[in-house]
Amino acid sequence: MKILCFFIVLLFVAVHGAVGFSRSPRYHMQCGYRGTFCTPGKCPHGNAYLGLCRPKYSCCRWL
């Protein structure tokens, strides 16, 4: 009976981990603070590119 409880807990942990793994990874950064802004496409000339803030939007920094 103890081993049955152990397997139920193990199954719960495995399913719980699989649910978290199925989500897509987050590659987007938070932008819009301390001199940064989010703009569609590429950053305007004279601004530094920092990364993506959402799909097809660039996170830029004022220079």
Curated annotation (Swiss-Prot):
Strong expression in the bone marrow and testis. Widely expressed. Weak expression in the ovarian stroma, but not expressed in the ovarian follicles. Its main location: secreted. Has bactericidal activity. Potent activity against S.typhimurium and S.entiriditis. It is found in: Secreted; Cytoplasmic granule. Disulfide bonds join 31-59, 38-53, 43-60. It comes from Gallus gallus (Chicken). Residues 1-19 form the signal peptide. Residues 20-25 form a propeptide. Belongs to the beta-defensin family. GO terms for molecular function: CCR6 chemokine receptor binding; chemoattractant activity. GO terms for biological process: cell chemotaxis; defense response to bacterium; defense response to fungus; defense response to Gram-negative bacterium; defense response to Gram-positive bacterium. The keyword GTP-binding does not apply. This is Gallinacin-4.
